[in-house]
């Protein structure tokens, strides 16, 4: 079975496909197309760019980043579950298909009792991770988690944190799974709030974003560009430090998480019996 996922650059959310699926799916997964069966898994992949051939098994995927899937793609699809109610509504599915993002399965695979030696961490969206942002985090007294680091390293750092500030959605999903309170922030126009609400609504969590300045690296070479970068960096550092001390962190209920995990596992068990 071909595992269809975003592969152009490493990113925690996309890499979770290779980390999680072998633990829950019995069918061997391939990284190159060619199989008659396609697993469409973790990520915002339900759009017009779905593979043109094969049976598409949709397991927790979200809609976005383009137009709706073509009629041909939908005819070839076996939807087992999707990321949330926004995706289900967009595709005209019964709301019962909106279970959650498969990233919550980390609750089943990971040590939930890691030593908490990180007070507060920050995990940016993968399009905005660089040394300048890491430096600003350190100056704010906040631990920086690189979203392109290996899955095991990201999971370990989130699990060791008492709190997580994040503009990376799968950072929040991992934190929820590991029972680490999290706070969502918008750091650029690349952040898509509806993706977050799609997943969060599946766990009955209300998402309210705080804002941080967009930090580019390197700054524009002109004197004005360097001054603007310095000013934005100072604001970023100050706001991040304030957020780290705030009471706005959230965590869904154990009951709702357990309910979604149980439904997801039952669906995956049924999938394994038929493949």
Language-model regions: role of each:
Residues 1-275:
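Active-site anion-handling motifs in enzyme catalytic cores
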């Amino acid at each position: 079975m071909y595992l269809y996922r975003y592969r152009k650059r490493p990113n925690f959310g996309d890499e979770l496909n290779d980390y999680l699926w072998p633990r829950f799916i019995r069918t061997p997964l391939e990284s190159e197309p060619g199989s008659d069966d396609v697993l469409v898994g973790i990520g915002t992949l339900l759009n017009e760019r779905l593979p043109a051939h094969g049976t598409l098994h949709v397991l927790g995927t979200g809609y976005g980043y383009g137009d709706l899937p073509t009629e041909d793609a939908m005819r070839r699809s076996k939807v087992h579950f999707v990321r949330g109610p926004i995706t289900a509504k967009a595709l005209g599915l019964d709301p019962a298909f909106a279970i959650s993002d498969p990233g919550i399965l980390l609750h089943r695979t990971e040590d939930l009792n890691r030593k908490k030696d990180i007070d507060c961490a920050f995990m940016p969206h993968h399009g905005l991770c660089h040394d300048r942002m890491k430096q600003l985090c350190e100056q704010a007294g906040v631990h920086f988690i690189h979203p392109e680091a290996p899955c095991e390293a990201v999971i370990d750092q989130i699990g060791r944190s008492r709190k997580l500030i994040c503009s990376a959605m799968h950072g929040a999903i991992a934190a929820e799974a590991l029972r680490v309170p999290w706070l969502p922030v918008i750091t650029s126009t690349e952040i898509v709030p509806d993706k977050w609400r799609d997943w969060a609504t599946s766990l009955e969590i209300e998402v309210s974003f705080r804002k941080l300045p967009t930090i580019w690296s390197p700054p524009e070479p002109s004197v004005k560009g360097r001054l603007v970068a310095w000013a934005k960096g100072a604001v970023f550092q100050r706001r991040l430090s304030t957020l780290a001390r705030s009471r706005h962190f959230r965590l869904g209920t154990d009951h709702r998480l357990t309910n979604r995990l149980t439904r997801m596992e039952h669906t995956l068990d049924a999938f394994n019996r038929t493949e």
